[in-house]
């Protein structure tokens, strides 16, 4: 850790020296004096020249004033000369750079009655990240102001708890284990690989094997995925955003969503992470790519997915250094969204074992997985689905129904006059209800006469 910090300091010192050479500064410490703009330097020079000119002309004018008024007291003249000398000495003092100790000078809207919140500057002053001030981020209070959604979440949690299979887990080295032995094919697969990126950010040594994206791509996920299924892949916040998409395409998935985990530091403001050598800024978020396989439409496949129940953001406190566990909320998002009961968690740990999931990972301390027993939970027709109640179906968000031709109005072929089937432009002027030159019957919106009302 100390060697890493020393290396960062040496690199910073070298950058400052190179910058000083480019700017023509005498040393790295004098860079600040050269960063003033040309306009500022010109303004400072003009101000100094104006002050010197005023000092040079003020002494003769003062002497003439005393002579005109008959005041020739030498003491007063000496006092005035001393005052001028003091002012000139202050002017000749070297320029001192002003040091700002708080953000009051830079706050936005300070002249208004309602100053703006500058969360970026507040982070610089206090170390509190801007995401610390997002309200109602917890599962318990997120839907307090939305009673229908709160009731929907409660009903879905009860249904999921009733339909969950007993928790099963298998201790296995995923790199050497043939995952094709896992049966049956799964509706949901969650991958949480121990990436090298996680340990670069923490600056500690990994206590397990770090997986590269080449190793992850070799996994035969497509062999254990159902024809209609979803995958959730934690990919960090760096190169994994692109390489994770490559993995999804190789396994036959299409990326359809990006769930973002935003980390707060309310409990430990100002804590700085070890800077990733491959990053410019300190990253405070991670991404979980979501992929879809097969044809699933939210408007027609309500038996398999319930869309728009949760949001695609997870906002929780950042874990301690060295802890690479992901928030448990990802399980709630998956269970609320997909109604499939065959759920697989790869690279799981003892802390992630939960009902309704088959957990596989090298760090598990025990195993209870039995292929025949697990397959028996889904032997009945449609038993791989959790099902849905009438109340859940009524409360859940739905896509608007498609509009038919009759809903749009009309249904009869175009033609005739503007209002209906009478196509003449003045041929039947003697008929009742005739509309003159435009033709047709006056109607509403539908039917043969553009409104469906029979002619009177």
UniProtKB/Swiss-Prot annotation:
The keyword Cytoplasm does not apply. Residues 45-76, 393-456 are annotated as: Disordered. This is N(6)-adenosine-methyltransferase non-catalytic subunit METTL14. It is found in: Nucleus. The gene is METTL14. GO terms for cellular component: nucleus; RNA N6-methyladenosine methyltransferase complex. GO terms for biological process: forebrain radial glial cell differentiation; gliogenesis; mRNA destabilization; mRNA modification; mRNA processing; mRNA splicing, via spliceosome; RNA methylation; spermatogenesis. Residues 425-440 have a biased composition (Basic and acidic residues). Residues 409-423, 441-450 have a biased composition (Gly residues). The modification Phosphoserine is found at residue 399. Residues 245-254, 297-298 are annotated as: Positively charged region required for RNA-binding.
């Amino acid at each position: 850790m100390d060697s890493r910090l020393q290396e960062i300091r040496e690199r910073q010192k070298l950058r400052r020296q190179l910058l000083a050479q480019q700017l023509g500064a005498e040393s790295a410490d004098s860079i600040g004096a050269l960063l003033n703009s040309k306009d500022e330097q010109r303004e400072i020079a003009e101000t100094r020249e104006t002050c010197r000119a005023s000092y040079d002309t003020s002494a003769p004018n003062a002497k003439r004033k005393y002579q005109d008024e008959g005041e020739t007291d030498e003491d007063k003249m000496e006092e005035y000369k001393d005052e001028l000398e003091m002012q000139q000495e202050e002017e000749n003092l070297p320029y001192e750079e002003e040091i700002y100790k708080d953000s009051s000078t830079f706050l936005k809207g300070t002249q208004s009655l309602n100053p703006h919140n500058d969360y970026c500057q507040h982070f610089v002053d206090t170390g509190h990240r801007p995401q610390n001030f997002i309200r109602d981020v917890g599962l318990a209070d997120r839907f307090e102001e939305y009673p229908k959604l709160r009731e929907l979440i409660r009903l879905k949690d009860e249904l999921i708890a009733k339909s969950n299979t007993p928790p099963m887990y298998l201790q296995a080295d995923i790199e050497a284990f043939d995952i094709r032995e896992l049966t049956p094919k799964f509706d949901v697969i969650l991958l949480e690989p121990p990436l090298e990126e996680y340990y670069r950010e923490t600056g500690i040594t990994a206590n397990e094997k770090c997986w590269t994206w080449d190793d992850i791509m070799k996994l035969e996920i497509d062999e254990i995925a159902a024809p209609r299924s979803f995958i959730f892949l934690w990919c960090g916040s760096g190169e994994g955003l692109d390489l994770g998409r490559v993995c999804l395409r190789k396994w036959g998935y299409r990326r359809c969503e990006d769930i973002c985990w935003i980390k707060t530091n309310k409990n430990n403001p100002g804590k700085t992470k070890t800077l990733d050598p491959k990053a410019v800024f300190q990253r405070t978020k991670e991404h979980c790519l979501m992929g879809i396989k097969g044809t699933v439409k939210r408007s027609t496949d309500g038996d398999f997915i319930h869309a728009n129940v949760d949001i695609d953001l997870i906002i929780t406190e950042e874990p301690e250094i060295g802890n690479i566990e992901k928030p448990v909320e990802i399980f709630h998002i998956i269970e609320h969204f997909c109604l499939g009961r065959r759920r697989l968690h790869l690279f799981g740990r003892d802390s992630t074992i939960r009902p309704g999931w088959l957990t596989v990972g090298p760090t598990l301390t025990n195993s209870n997985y039995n292929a025949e027993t697990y397959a028996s939970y889904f032997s009945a027709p449609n038993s791989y689905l959790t099902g849905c109640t009438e109340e859940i179906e009524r409360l859940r968000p739905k896509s608007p129904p498609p509009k038919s031709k009759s809903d749009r109005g009309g249904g009869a072929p175009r033609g005739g006059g503007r209002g209906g089937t009478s196509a003449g432009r003045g041929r039947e002027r003697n008929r009742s209800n005739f509309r003159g030159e435009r033709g047709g019957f006056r109607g509403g919106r539908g039917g043969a006469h553009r409104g469906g009302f029979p002619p009177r």
